[in-house]
């Protein structure tokens, strides 16, 4: 079992994931690796001067070493499972579609990371290289060879420090030095490749994520609606989005997460604003920053756009390939002996790794000391290692005496979108949060993939007729957006009805 660590492609290391308990309990060989990170691992000039993806090439070199040498450790070179979390999970997905990775592994597990997330692949690498070169006072930022020659004369630590400066201005500093479509490791963007027949390694895969997602305390973020707008636009990474498209997208997000499903205080404040606007005592745009998402709502937005929606889109695309067996999960366990889980909102980013690597069995002095923690760890280890051995996390006729509480993990298919909820008592459900996933995977692309074209003229100091036309065009855009939203939600409702409702448990065959 070959583990690829996460860390936004710029931090972390294999040494933080001790594999001895997983290896002993699961009777497998565990390999953890390091690879080049940040600007040293993923700088790309978008040409042959510096193609990028050096961190991924390091991973391939490690996989080749395993293939050539694992037999000396009692392993099978034709039975290698790659698994990774967060950016490491995205790397797993990229290896699935890379021609350079073919034949180096036989199974794959992508945990809380998808190669089709907007953060997973950089579409504007040249911009950040030029920004870095300016920070380092390179003489010519327009010539790739000159930039590279300049960088090679500068101390690596200084380059790393300035690469952090080069990301300033990006909301939450999503990774900017990250994998690129270089024409060799990654022939095209992941979504395009996943839609092409024969474009991926025909191996079993399962992917999933946590029930909740936090890796920083949202209460420490001075969040406003304007900041949320910038964050959304940064994540969708669409420079051509017009002001009206961005406003409609932001309004749709607020409608979905705050106004429709927000807290009682949100609804109360919204009604007060609507009353003021109807009385003419408050202009419409004055409420731009006054209704803010609470911590849970903010975490849900970040989780959905970063990880959950891309994970669902990934498994849906994988079902188009008959040669690939797909399993999907959600980790939903939070120990009462976990200070991070108590501080945030339950299971959090990377929390399942503690159980997969057997931390509750390592006699920690300050966390994960409960009997339930050990039981969940045993469950996760068995599921992960059974998949590594058999290509099925709950194989029938194997280890029957150790079956996870008569739990059978069913495949995720185009006809039956099953997923497993993992915790003390795993169970199978269907239609994973389908309304919100449909919102991000089908409704939002209407604005990010297809620009709304409007006149660049402003309404200030223009004739009355032109002003009316501008307002009419604006109204038409909003009306179209609302109609599309209604259609998407209707389709979602039909799907939910077809699948017998969200989170409806499926009888488990014994």
Regions found by a protein language model. Give the residues of each.
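Non-transmembrane alpha-helical segments in soluble domains
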Residues: 1, 60-63, 67, 93-96, ...
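Serine-hydrolase-like catalytic core of hydrolytic proteins
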Residues: 1-144, 148, 184-187, 191-211
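Single-pass type I membrane-protein transmembrane alpha-helix
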Residues: 66, 475-499
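Substrate-gating cap/lid region and adjacent catalytic-acid/histidine neighborhood
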Residues: 115, 153, 157-374, 390, ...
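Extracellular/luminal ectodomains of metazoan preproproteins built from arrays
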Residues: 163, 426-465
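Non-catalytic, well-ordered alpha-helical segments in soluble enzyme domains
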Residues: 373-396
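Extracellular juxtamembrane-to-transmembrane boundary of type I single-pass membrane glycoproteins
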Residues: 457-483
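Cytosolic C-terminal tails of single-pass type I membrane
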Residues: 498-510
């Amino acid at each position: 079992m070959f583990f690829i660590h996460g860390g936004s492609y710029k931090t972390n290391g294999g040494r933080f994931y001790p594999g001895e308990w997983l290896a002993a309990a699961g009777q497998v060989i565990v390999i953890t690796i390091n690879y080049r990170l940040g600007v040293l691992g993923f700088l790309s000039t978008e040409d042959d001067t510096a193609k990028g993806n050096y961190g991924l090439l390091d991973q391939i070199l490690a996989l080749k070493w395993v293939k050539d040498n694992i037999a000396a450790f009692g392993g099978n070179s034709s039975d290698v499972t790659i698994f990774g979390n967060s950016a490491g999970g995205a790397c797993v997905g990229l290896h699935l579609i890379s021609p350079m990775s073919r034949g180096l592994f036989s199974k794959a597990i992508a945990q809380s990371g998808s190669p089709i997330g907007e953060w997973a692949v950089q579409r504007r690498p040249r911009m950040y290289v030029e920004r870095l070169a300016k920070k380092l006072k390179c003489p010519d930022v327009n010539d790739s060879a000159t930039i590279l020659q300049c960088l090679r004369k500068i101390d690596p630590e200084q380059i790393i420090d300035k690469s952090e400066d080069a990301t300033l201005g990006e909301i939450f500093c999503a990774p900017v030095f990250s994998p690129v479509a270089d024409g060799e490791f990654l022939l095209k963007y992941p979504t395009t490749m996943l839609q092409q027949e024969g474009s991926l390694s025909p191996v079993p895969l399962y992917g999933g994520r946590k029930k909740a997602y936090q890796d920083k305390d949202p209460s420490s973020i001075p969040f406003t609606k304007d900041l949320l707008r910038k964050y959304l636009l940064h994540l969708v990474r669409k420079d051509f989005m017009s002001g009206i498209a961005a406003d409609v997208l932001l309004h749709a997000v607020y409608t979905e997460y705050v106004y429709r499903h927000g807290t009682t205080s949100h609804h109360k404040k919204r009604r007060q604003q609507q009353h003021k606007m109807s009385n003419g005592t408050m202009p419409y745009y004055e409420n731009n920053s006054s209704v803010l998402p609470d911590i849970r709502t903010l975490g849900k937005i970040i989780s959905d756009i970063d990880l959950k929606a891309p994970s669902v889109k990934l498994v849906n695309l994988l079902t188009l390939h008959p040669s690939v067996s797909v399993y999907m999960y959600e980790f939903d366990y939070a120990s009462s002996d976990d200070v991070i889980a108590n501080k945030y909102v339950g299971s959090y980013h990377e929390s399942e790794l503690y159980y997969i690597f057997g931390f509750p069995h390592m006699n920690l002095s300050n966390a994960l000391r409960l009997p339930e923690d050990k039981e969940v760890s045993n469950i996760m280890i068995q599921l992960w290692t059974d998949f590594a051995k058999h290509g099925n996390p709950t194989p029938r006729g194997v280890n029957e005496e150790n079956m996870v509480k008569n739990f059978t993990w069913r495949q995720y298919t185009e006809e039956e979108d099953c997923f497993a909820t993992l915790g003390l008592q795993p169970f199978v459900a269907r239609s994973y949060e389908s309304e919100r996933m449909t919102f991000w995977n089908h409704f939002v692309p209407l604005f990010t993939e297809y620009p709304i074209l409007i006149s660049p003229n402003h309404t200030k100091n223009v004739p009355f007729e032109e002003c009316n036309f501008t307002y009419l065009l604006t109204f038409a855009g909003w009306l179209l957006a609302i109609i599309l939203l209604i259609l998407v939600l209707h389709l979602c409702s039909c799907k939910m009805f077809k699948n017998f409702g969200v989170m409806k448990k499926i009888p488990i065959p014994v």
